[in-house]
Amino acid sequence: MNQDHFISIIPGLSDVLGAQSSRQDALELLRNNSETYRKFQSFPAGEQNKLLSFIMGQRGLKITYDSFFQRIMSPELHPGRLESFLSELMGEEVHIEKILPREGIRLAEEASLIIMDILVQLSDGSRVNVEMQKIGLYFPGERSSCYAADAIMRQYTELRGRLKEKFSYKEMKPFFLIVLMEHSSAPFQKAAPGYIHTEKIYYDSGAEVASLAKIKYISLDTFRDSVHNISNKLEAWLTFFSSDEPADIIALVNAYPEFRELYQEIAEFRTKPEELIHMYSEALAIADRNTIRLMIDDMKEELDSLTNQVAEQKSELARQENEIARQENEIVRQESELAKRDDEIARLRAENERLRRETQ
């Protein structure tokens, strides 16, 4: 497809991403720095083509990597953007009061698995952690519960230390954990076409008891498969997070012009190949570590499954052996019973024979 035809079927793309350039110009820009070009050549062919298309201005760039996301959605540089997304997701206007340090059990155990992680405190004291997973992690409920419990306990410790004897549990504020997954894991794929998964806690008696942990998962892959027209601001944000397709960019900017500024900031990387390739290289390295870790998890899960199967088979074999032993014991008992009956019959016959002789 030539460049003129591309522009004609996607009008307005140059207004958002800047004037388009040729493939040769894009390659020359990369070759200006030998180290940058060497890194570029080390990328898989598919990733090279995506980057070239971006530098040429023919498509956008996904920001589902920490380095890119932090540039565009940084609560320090652009608090209004994260506030806008959170307000749409939570159904009420929120304001970020401060950014909190990213610490705790998640970073100790899973730093290489999380490609974006932002923790903020809202004006009402609530805390919100927004994280992006390139590939949905295993055991999402267990992991999220542990992290939420750790975050809530840290809030409790801070309040106890600051308020001392004036502390009351009513001072505790909710902790919101929002997990965006570019490729969601099996439990969420089974819930398609639903793509926003909100944890609900109910008591069978109907009692209403507050819970501080508020957890939401968002399946961006299911969203892309299920939603084809942007009908509200939340869908606009999820489209921005999940798609780099030219048609989606144009549709989004036409529906919500405020996103033009975000795309233009992304487009600035077109003229900064060294920075672009460096950040992309880091992103791919993280993705590789994620893939390796998930492959290990896969193998562990398969090993656990095989171990359970072997245990079940051993248990079944033991049950069958016990059944055989029981049946053998039953046979011995029956044989013993038959032998007793044979002895009794022989005794009765002998008695009958004795009596018959006495009567003769």
Tell what function each PLM region has.
Residues 77-81, 139, 232, 257, ...:
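Charged, alpha-helix-enriched surfaces in structured cytosolic catalytic cores
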